[in-house]
Structures are given as C-alpha cells and as structure tokens.
C-alpha cells in the first residue's frame, strides 16, 4: 500500500496525456532537456576556467620587509 506499482504509474501517465495532450508534454520535455543541457554546459565552462586561474604564476615575495606608515585623509 505504501508504494505505487507500474500499473498505477501507467494510469497516471494516461490521465496526464489526456489532460495536457502529447504536444504540450513534448514541449515541456524539450524545455526541460534544454535547461539540463545548458546547466551541464555552464558547469563544464566553470570547470574549464578553474585550471586556467590556478595555472597563473603567483608573484614570489622576497625576504625584504617594506615598512609603510599610513596617513588618514581628512575631508576639507
């Protein structure tokens, strides 16, 4: 009683097709597939950019210390 059998799902599918029609369901499926594809492409682009950022050499700081005194700017 807790789970649905395949027959329950087939009846639900037939009712949904009768209500919305196959054309509407096909359009929804295409839109959903396009959204998933766009998300995957975006993730690939984000992962492709990440190694490029890591490959940039960092500036090596020598053993010299620079002592700087900061003065506050007053409003006139």
Curated annotation (Swiss-Prot):
Chain intervals for the UniProt region annotation (Disordered): 47-76
Organism: Dechloromonas aromatica (strain RCB)
Annotated compartments: Cell inner membrane
A Pfam family assignment: TatA_B_E
Recorded topology in the membrane: Single-pass membrane protein
Job of this protein: Part of the twin-arginine translocation (Tat) system that transports large folded proteins containing a characteristic twin-arginine motif in their signal peptide across membranes. TatA could form the protein-conducting channel of the Tat system.
Protein name: Sec-independent protein translocase protein TatA
NCBIfam families named among the record's database cross-references: PRK02958.1, tatAE
Subunit structure: The Tat system comprises two distinct complexes: a TatABC complex, containing multiple copies of TatA, TatB and TatC subunits, and a separate TatA complex, containing only TatA subunits. Substrates initially bind to the TatABC complex, which probably triggers association of the separate TatA complex to form the active translocon.
Cellular component, GO annotation: TAT protein transport complex
Cysteine pairs bridged by disulfides in the record: none
Keywords from the UniProt entry: Cell inner membrane, Cell membrane, Membrane, Protein transport, Translocation, Transmembrane, Transmembrane helix, Transport
Bias (Basic and acidic residues): 66-76
HAMAP family reported for this sequence: TatA_E
């Amino acid at each position: 009683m807790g789970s649905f059998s395949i027959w329950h799902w087939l009846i639900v599918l037939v009712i949904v097709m009768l209500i919305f029609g196959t054309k509407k369901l096909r359009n929804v499926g295409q839109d959903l597939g396009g959204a998933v594809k766009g998300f995957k492409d975006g993730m690939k682009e984000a992962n492709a950019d990440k190694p490029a950022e890591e490959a940039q050499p960092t500036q090596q700081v020598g053993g010299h210390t620079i002592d700087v005194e900061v003065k506050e700017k007053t409003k006139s």
